[in-house]
């Protein structure tokens, strides 16, 4: 089932750590990406903009296959 705008999601560790995006940045991803709820605030093509509200952090673009419903 595809992820929709406004849905609560979390990142899938295995897919994010082994992605092309991970090779371009620091691979020490913070735990909140995998353990807390994030809200999908926008979707463009294969990417979703996710806002994690538990901690004061910037929104992050993740591929749709790197997130799952929480």
UniProtKB/Swiss-Prot annotation:
Q: Which GO terms describe its cellular component?
A: plasma membrane-derived thylakoid membrane
Q: Which keywords does this chain's UniProt record carry?
A: Membrane, NAD, NADP, Plastoquinone, Quinone, Thylakoid, Translocase, Transport
Catalytic reaction(s) noted: a plastoquinone + NADH + (n+1) H(+)(in) = a plastoquinol + NAD(+) + n H(+)(out); a plastoquinone + NADPH + (n+1) H(+)(in) = a plastoquinol + NADP(+) + n H(+)(out)
What does the record say about its membrane topology?
A: Peripheral membrane protein
- Localization per record: Cellular thylakoid membrane
Q: What is its EC number?
A: 7.1.1.-
Q: Quaternary state and partners of this protein?
A: NDH-1 can be composed of about 15 different subunits; different subcomplexes with different compositions have been identified which probably have different functions.
Designated name of the protein? NAD(P)H-quinone oxidoreductase subunit O
According to its UniProt entry, this protein's organism is Trichormus variabilis (strain ATCC 29413 / PCC 7937)
